[in-house]
């Protein structure tokens, strides 16, 4: 198996000012491409430190990836360090400089004088286009080894690395399928599938769970076993298909927007404890404007009454966190927006506000098209976890409703 190493560059990483998301992403991707990552190191913005690390690792690995330090400032030293170690010159690429300037002009009226540094290319390097930012990457082949320079911001690095994956894939590449579930506990899912998952030794099985993506069942094998894994997935879906919301990179909100489009339904949401989180998830999906009419954040009781038409008597008798309140919220929202389907959320996110009857984490969610489908939940976790789980469960309930189930 080929070996790889990663050098993440930036003093801000060493000082703990930002998380090293690039290392996590690259380690996962390189494993799938058939590499064994033997080292991940973080180096500050220092020419000697970067150069020494590059020189050391080039003796040990087949693929070396450096991230960060490709900007225009004097402390962006990755190009200089690699050129120094390889004993190659840095040359100004005029065509590249023009492209960089054109990108910058779209967002800034003035071009920084030091921008030329981003157009310095190591002799013999292939320039890698950056579709998001201004800092291009570079790829070099050195005695059969590959050296790749990528920018530091993950939103720039990820699409640039993805564009290289076909070129980097090895004979030891892995085939992986990730199945995603939300409303079924990890232990229950594993119990349902144990005869399928653990009666074989060809596919590596891993389950992960969090409050954002729910339960993820990750199945990994070598590419030569692709057909075996595909058959295994079919058996899994025969048992758990109704609980599945997505595969691999699919997000819950993307699935919901697609289902709304397929069924030609419009959506509006009324939120209390989630404070616009549900709306934000939906509008993050490209094309959501075709189906999403809008949302109301009715945090106070006054807004619930005056905007959504929740009755004073309902609030006094049952409270804002109640089945009756969320049902009146969706009814009022339907009158207000004319949406085909309305969803409302009201709950106690904490840390205060709970009672013995309605402790912190109590959340009501209602879906209303022709009749109400109302659910009560008792979520655990801190304030942000409760709010996130509420928004995600609203999407999960809506997904099930759109898939045709009478009850969620």
From Swiss-Prot:
InterPro entries: CinA, CinA-like_C, CinA_C, CinA_KH, Competence-induced_CinA, MoaB/Mog-like_dom_sf, MoaB/Mog_dom. It comes from the Bacteria. Pfam families: CinA (PF02464), CinA_KH (PF18146), MoCF_biosynth (PF00994). Signal peptide: none annotated. CDD domains: cinA. Belongs to the CinA family. PANTHER family: NICOTINAMIDE-NUCLEOTIDE AMIDOHYDROLASE PNCC (PTHR13939), NMN AMIDOHYDROLASE-LIKE PROTEIN YFAY (PTHR13939:SF0). This is CinA-like protein. It comes from Thermotoga maritima (strain ATCC 43589 / DSM 3109 / JCM 10099 / NBRC 100826 / MSB8).
């Amino acid at each position: 198996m080929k070996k790889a190493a990663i050098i993440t560059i930036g003093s801000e990483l060493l000082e703990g000012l930002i998380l090293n998301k690039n290392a996590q992403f690259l380690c996962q991707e390189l494993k799938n491409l058939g590499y064994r990552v033997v080292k991940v190191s973080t180096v500050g913005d220092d020419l000697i430190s970067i150069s020494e690390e590059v020189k050391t690792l080039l003796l040990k690995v087949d693929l070396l990836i450096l991230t960060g330090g490709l900007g225009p400032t004097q402390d962006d030293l990755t190009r200089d360090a690699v050129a120094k170690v390889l004993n190659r010159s840095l040359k100004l690429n005029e065509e590249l400089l023009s492209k960089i300037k054109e990108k910058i002009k779209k967002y800034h009226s003035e071009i920084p004088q030091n921008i030329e540094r981003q157009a310095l290319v190591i002799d013999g390097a292939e320039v890698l286009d950056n579709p998001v930012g201004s800092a291009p990457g570079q790829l070099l082949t050195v005695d059969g080894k590959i050296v790749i320079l990528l920018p530091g911001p993950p939103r720039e690095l990820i699409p640039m690395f993805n564009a290289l994956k076909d070129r980097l894939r090895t004979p030891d590449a892995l085939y992986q399928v990730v199945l995603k579930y939300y409303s079924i506990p990890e232990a229950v899912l594993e119990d349902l599938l144990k005869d399928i998952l653990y009666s074989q030794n060809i596919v590596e099985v891993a389950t992960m769970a969090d409050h954002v993506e729910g339960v993820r069942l990750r199945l990994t094998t070598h590419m030569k076993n692709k057909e075996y894994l595909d058959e295994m997935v079919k058996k899994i879906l025969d048992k758990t298909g109704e609980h599945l919301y997505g595969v691999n990179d699919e997000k819950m909100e993307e699935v919901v927007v697609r289902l709304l489009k397929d069924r030609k339904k419009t959506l509006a949401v009324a939120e209390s404890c989630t404070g616009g989180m549900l709306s934000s998830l939906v509008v993050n999906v490209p094309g959501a404007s075709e189906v999403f009419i809008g949302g109301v954040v009715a945090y106070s009781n006054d807004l619930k009454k005056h905007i959504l038409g929740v009755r004073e008597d309902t609030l006094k008798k049952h409270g804002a966190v109640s089945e009756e309140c969320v049902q009146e919220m969706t009814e009022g929202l339907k009158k207000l927006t004319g949406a085909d389907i309305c969803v409302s959320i009201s709950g106690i996110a904490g840390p205060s506000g709970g009672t013995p009857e309605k402790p912190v984490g109590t959340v009501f969610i209602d879906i209303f098209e022709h009749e109400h489908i109302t659910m009560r939940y008792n979520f655990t976790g801190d304030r942000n976890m409760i709010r996130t789980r509420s928004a995600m469960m609203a999407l999960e309930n809506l997904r099930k409703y759109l898939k045709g189930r009478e009850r969620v």
